Amino acid sequence: MTLLITGDSIVSAEAVWDHVTMANRELAFKAGDVIKVLDASNKDWWWGQIDDEEGWFPASFVRLWVNQEDEVEEGPSDVQNGHLDPNSDCLCLGRPLQNRDQMRANVINEIMSTERHYIKHLKDICEGYLKQCRKRRDMFSDEQLKVIFGNIEDIYRFQMGFVRDLEKQYNNDDPHLSEIGPCFLEHQDGFWIYSEYCNNHLDACMELSKLMKDSRYQHFFEACRLLQQMIDIAIDGFLLTPVQKICKYPLQLAELLKYTAQDHSDYRYVAAALAVMRNVTQQINERKRRLENIDKIAQWQASVLDWEGEDILDRSSELIYTGEMAWIYQPYGRNQQRVFFLFDHQMVLCKKDLIRRDILYYKGRIDMDKYEVVDIEDGRDDDFNVSMKNAFKLHNKETEEIHLFFAKKLEEKIRWLRAFREERKMVQEDEKIGFEISENQKRQAAMTVRKVPKQKGVNSARSVPPSYPPPQDPLNHGQYLVPDGIAQSQVFEFTEPKRSQSPFWQNFSRLTPFKK
């Protein structure tokens, strides 16, 4: 590695996970970014560049491109700028081009190797930790074990079947001829079990943090690790591996597709598998984002006066759309102006204060699971005996109740109709993968919004690597997870970029009572 750098070759590394940092001299990046490595003399922290930014980054957060030392010198590449053309063969300059079949074989071998190591880690968690915990009823309740380990046993069983099929497709003599794409397609529905695990992971970390304040639990978990002859990583590091693993599949498949010729029998299967796994990680990331927003929903509900009935979080986890419309509940009823908040499963009706327009009063809700949306053409409605423009109805399929709504503009009506379709789609997808908010997450949201204090910046000069230990990949034999002072949830993020905060939350800040 150092020889390549000192030999004036451009050495590129791909980010396996996001590196979110609050230190000025560290280099921040997202999973999938390509980093130009400038200094690898320190085994833990490397110095690299993306675009015009330079800084230190943990070596364990990146992976050197396979076959890098064997590729051809070409013209200036986007690799130098931290971006890579997926159709480009240039990952490093200054070496002769290696046979594409050998490149594909290297990627296949890497995939198989990581899968075998991953299975061992899952086995260690289930047999080394969970099995031993179940024997100690005096220390762990069933509820605690469910929070800490989630559905790790389901993941272990699924992965064993998946790896078994991978091994059948692996060509030991000629790895480049292996056809592993179909394995991902055959097991695509099974990968959704990772959603439950990832959503529960924050609860697991909090529960472990509470237990680790007691030295008995520290000694117990360490004894479990030694008894199972596991590598020197704390239990929270092992429990992080499934979160990391599901994020890594799109990166591996993208690299495999890059070195798979279009006339290869596995090409179309790998391309399809890449699309499937990108969708899986994107949806898991989306649900993680929603869980991060539930405290905002709880805060908003607390700001609404005269609230009645169940909490929003008892059924919903996402604000989809909001706006002000005219509303008639029953035939010959009075036209009323209301502010509507559409969540998954329900729509909340609020009234603005006559004097303080930023104060909201609760006026009811509509169960979206029982209603269907009916688009209405402009004209006169015989049922309500009113002239309609930019109108639509919500019709209760059981009781025949009807709500009539009037948007101010046609564009606003179209946005509402689109939002209702999105709400139904979200509900169906959540039901498919069993997405729900845990009782512990609801309690946490009801109590407070967890805030991470910002650290003061430091000199951005190159100087020396950070003094604290770097975060390490538990799939390798590292010892640490996160630098001191940096929350674990900030370091390990999902593959897909986070969506920006919904503009609706900006509206909420204007609709809170008694603003100072």
Curated annotation (Swiss-Prot):
Keywords: Cytoplasm, Disease variant, Epilepsy, Guanine-nucleotide releasing factor, Phosphoprotein, SH3 domain, Synapse. The modification Phosphoserine is found at S502. Its main location: cytoplasm. One of its GO terms (cellular component) is postsynaptic density. Residues 103-287 form the DH domain. Residues 453-480 are annotated as: Disordered. Residues 318-425 form the PH domain. It is found in: Cytoplasm; Postsynaptic density. CDD domains: PH_Collybistin_ASEF (cd01224), RhoGEF (cd00160), SH3_ARHGEF9 (cd11975). One of its GO terms (molecular function) is guanyl-nucleotide exchange factor activity. Detected in brain. Detected at low levels in heart. InterPro entries: ARHGEF9_SH3, DBL_dom_sf, DH_dom, PH-like_dom_sf, PH_domain, SH3-like_dom_sf, SH3_domain, SOS1_NGEF_PH. GO terms for biological process: regulation of postsynaptic specialization assembly; regulation of small GTPase mediated signal transduction. It holds the Pfam family RhoGEF. Residues 100-110 are annotated as: Interaction with GPHN. The keyword Cell cycle does not apply. Residues 8-67 form the SH3 domain. It is linked to Developmental and epileptic encephalopathy 8: A disorder characterized by hyperekplexia and early infantile epileptic encephalopathy. Neurologic features include exaggerated startle response, seizures, impaired psychomotor development, and intellectual disability. Seizures can be provoked by tactile stimulation or extreme emotion. Acts as a guanine nucleotide exchange factor (GEF) for CDC42. Promotes formation of GPHN clusters. Interacts with GPHN. This is Rho guanine nucleotide exchange factor 9.
